[in-house]
């Protein structure tokens, strides 16, 4: 079994560790901002052995800190080091927009992630929602197609796996939210 944990910050609540421990036949992938990682958290994950965190990054320091707050990039890098040093698998999640598409899918960024120990990246397409959605941040059709090309190139030329939520949708039958819940 495999479960993805989304919404909020899963490392903020201690009861998640009890769930991971109780269901040790399930592999969990919690998506995290990475700000709560320290030796204690890394040791717990090492002991559990069934949790693969996905750190949210919007690119390098400039892109990540401008979207997520000053100092977040460095904190995520520290968290990655803690996990890598313990042999704990982890990956990265990026919300792609016109501001960061060239960074998060660049060879330089992927090479940095590989050196840090990341095994994979998820690319999610920015969708404008809320009271004041900014459609200018949405990827253009050509940028979406280019992301698919870059994703396939990374998969075939690097020891790294990428999932492009837009272009890979046909392989998984599309988005279940759009098919069953909306």
Where does each model-flagged region fall?
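Radical SAM/AdoMet-radical enzyme domain recognition
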Residues: 1-6, 13-125
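A C-terminal junction/extension of Radical SAM enzymes
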Residues: 126-182
């Amino acid at each position: 079994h495999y479960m993805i944990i989304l919404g909020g910050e899963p490392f903020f609540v201690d009861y998640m560790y009890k769930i991971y421990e109780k269901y040790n036949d399930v592999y969990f992938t919690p998506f995290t901002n990475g700000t709560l990682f320290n030796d204690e958290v890394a040791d717990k994950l090492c002991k559990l052995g069934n949790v693969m965190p996905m750190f949210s990054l919007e690119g390098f320091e400039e892109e990540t800190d401008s979207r997520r707050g000053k100092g977040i990039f460095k904190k995520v890098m520290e968290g990655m080091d803690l996990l890598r040093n313990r042999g704990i698998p982890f990956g990265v999640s990026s919300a792609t927009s016109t501001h960061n598409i060239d960074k998060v899918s660049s060879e330089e960024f992927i090479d940095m992630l590989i050196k840090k120990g990341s095994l994979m990246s998820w690319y999610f397409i920015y969708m404008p929602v809320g009271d004041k959605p900014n459609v200018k941040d949405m990827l253009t059709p050509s940028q979406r197609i280019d992301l698919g090309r870059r994703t396939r190139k990374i998969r075939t030329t690097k020891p790294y796996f990428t999932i492009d939520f837009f272009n890979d949708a046909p392989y998984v039958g599309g988005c279940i939210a759009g098919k069953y819940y909306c």
